[in-house]
Amino acid sequence: MAEPEERSLDDFFAKRDKKKKKDKGGSGSAAGSRGPARPSDGATSSSLSSYVSAAGKGVKKEKSGKSENPDQLQEKEEDEWKEFEQKEVDYSGLRLQSLQISNEKEDDENENKEEQGADWEESGGFGSDKSSGPWNKTAQAQAPISAVEEAPEPVHTGGVYRPPGARASVTTRKPQGPPEIYSDTQFPSPQATAKHTESRREKEMEKTFEIVKHKNRASNEAAKNPAPRPQLDNQYAVLGEQ
């Protein structure tokens, strides 16, 4: 168990050392590309002159690179934006002159209409149409026609409008009084039918019975016409004697 742990630790440290070496090599190459190392304070004149010449060469290279880049960009832009020149085509063989003439006429007519509309607005709507056409010809003066005078209709002031069918049959209505609340004809009810039947029965009963209005008059009539007396004797007594 101890051996694999030691191997894994060794591998880990070996990988870390490799990474450090790579980082150091990359930083050194970047420093070389930036330019020559700056000499120390105690350097000789020859080392200083070599440092200055190397720095000047680096500046010239950067300038030349910068000067070349805009030319390349301009060339690329010219390649991308190419002007398209349309070729002129001869349409004389297609006989399009008639179409062009008709279009010109329509344009002229539209311009005339716009001018006439402006004149009409300025004149307050009473401008005359100056364009030529059959609708602008002045009509010939016709002979004056004798106007037939019609009899004026009588003017009715006030009143209520009535249709012609109702005008002929006009009936005068009598003034009506207030409605009778207790009348069965104007205000019918379910009880009215029952009362009607009772009134018929009362009339039939009146025919059989006499109505006494005066006391003395009824007694006088009874004295004049005496009622027949009933026979109280036994009619079968004769049979008993035999």
From Swiss-Prot:
Q: Where does the record say this protein resides?
A: Cytoplasm
Biased composition (Low complexity) is annotated at 30-57
* Compositional bias of kind Basic and acidic residues: 1-15, 59-75, 195-213
Q: Which domain of life is it from?
A: Eukaryota
Instruction: Cite the residue spans of the region called Disordered.
Output: 1-242
In the UniProt record, does the keyword Acetylation occur? yes
Q: Where is the composition biased (Acidic residues)?
A: 105-122
Question: This protein is called what?
Answer: Protein CDV3 homolog B
Q: Which gene encodes it?
A: cdv3-b
